[in-house]
């Protein structure tokens, strides 16, 4: 009996030891996005996450979509990093299968810098980077780098004629960029127990997703200042005013980059127009079927509860200081035409509307209606008609308050 007890205890201890060693050597960031996010500076507006696996690269090989978004030069630089570092025979086994995070940051000089953050396996030794320079014909020069309290290296990549700065963080997580200033920001990150400034996908969603994108809308404004000459950024204008976070999964499609997921809106911040849709439920979009063939880009919006949306819109006008002007306009229309336009108009509205810009820079608005004939009769009272089906509104700001 004692012999069996001793054997059982030995087996239990061996099992416990193997379990501890196993989980110690598991790479935590691969299944813990939050830990990696803590190593990314808070001024990141967008983070793109994907798995460093050959299948991901095979799917998008030769596809022009990413180049259309990032530009061929930037995509070419990232691809060179992949080939010369992640797929290098000295490094590949330590980074294969790990999730790569590419974050977008504005710089002091009104430029955009990318930060690449990814974990290495627990058995990776940073000294292996020094061996890269000894590989014949790889065109990489390695020199030590000290960024704050963090150690790393500078990789001069001959194929790009550029330096790539790399530092080691906790838990064998590495951060690298062509911008030395951005790497220095990484070195200054203070560790806290607070959550990263991004909404995250669940572990299951993250594991099943081909790629993910995380958006911090509060940081889009400084990013757009680097991209656009003015703040009237058309379809992006509402996003500049939105306070919230999105965690989205990539849906594979050969001719489009499509993401779906959830957005968390910060209710105590400044309310933008998009906040009005926070309590609406998804509905089928049908207006897209009648978009003109010359459409360059569009914004489609829909509501599931028109009564609730109308109330939210009215409250938004009040907070924005437009309520008085709205009341004066509709009172004027009532006095001049005898038409209670607001009440009758809302009763005829459908639940979809869209704004379209064509490749000729024409702007069109499309609104779904419950009864087009009745709406046409109603609008005749407040318009200068050119024929029975078209005309110009007699009150300039009327579309704004619709």
Language-model segments: what does each one mean?
Residues 360-367, 373-376, 382:
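Ordered core of a single globular domain
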Residues 48, 154-192, 402:
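A short, solvent-exposed beta-edge/loop patch
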Residues 389-402:
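C-terminal soluble interaction/assembly domains
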Residues 164-185, 254-266, 270-276, 289:
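Charged, amphipathic alpha-helical scaffolding segments
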Residues 119-124, 178-183, 369-373:
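Helix N-cap motif at beta-to-alpha junctions
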Residues 132-142, 193-194, 383-392:
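A common structural junction motif
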Residues 144-149, 166-170, 254, 357-358, ...:
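Generic beta-strand structural signal
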Residues 2-7, 11-156, 198-243, 260-360:
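Structural boundary/hinge residues at secondary-structure and domain interfaces
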